[in-house]
A protein has these predicted regions:
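Long, terminal "pre-/pro-" and other extracytoplasmic accessory regions
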Residues: 2-207
Length: 207
């Protein structure tokens, strides 16, 4: 019997032997402990977000510049996903580019623009169904993720910290996360223009 199983059996035994008035008291203690753990988790999460934003503000390279560097590694490739990672020793942009049936993953130094480490490559068939469908849908639109970043930064009045693709009822959308001047994260969703030249429709909200 594992330690976890033993603990469960002991706890159930104590509850069975305890007088009726002791059970509500234990429940209250458990509820208080759960609330305390939740508050602690929220504090730790917020501290991690603050560190990430601080590292991002110090980055000399913009999101679009990192995308351009990654795309030049393979002529004709297009960015499908990009995120800022300030948790590593040196802050980097993690960029995924696609071309034909291949997907490359790059780490671009957020200060120097240098490529960190070796790129990894995978085949389209190796992706999960959602990611594969998004990449396939990217082939059907002319707008690039970098174009969506420009619009999102204007709409949310800030700097983009990440961008990705999202399927919305069969339609491809670009999702861009922007840090505004007040340090708030804004998510902007853009629908690529139709082939007849309709402009992008943007909607945004706080995260």
């Amino acid at each position: 019997m594992s330690n976890k199983q033993r603990f469960a059996v002991i706890l159930l035994s104590l509850l069975a032997l305890a007088p009726p008035f002791a059970i509500p008291q234990l429940s209250a203690m458990q509820e208080a402990a759960t609330q305390q753990e939740g508050a602690e988790d929220a504090r730790i999460h917020q501290e991690a977000v603050n560190r990430e934003l601080e590292a991002f503000r110090a980055a000399q390279l913009s999101l679009r510049q990192a995308m351009g560097i990654a795309e030049k590694r393979h002529a004709g490739s297009r960015t499908a996903d990009i995120s800022f990672d300030g948790a590593s020793g040196s802050p980097v942009y993690r960029v995924k580019t696609v071309q034909h049936n291949r997907l490359w993953e790059h780490a671009i130094d957020a200060k120097t623009g240098d490529t960190i480490g070796a790129e990894t490559v995978s085949h389209l068939k190796d992706l999960n169904p959602d990611d594969r469908n998004n990449v396939m849908a990217l082939r059907t639109v002319r707008q690039e993720l970098s174009d969506a970043v420009v619009i999102a930064e204007q709409v949310a009045s800030g700097r983009a910290i990440g961008g990705s693709l999202m399927d919305d009822n069969g339609k491809l959308n670009f999702v861009v996360v922007v840090v505004n001047g007040g340090g708030d994260l804004k998510q902007v969703v853009l629908e690529p223009p139709q082939t007849r030249g309709r402009g992008s429709n943007a909607r945004h909200g706080s995260r």
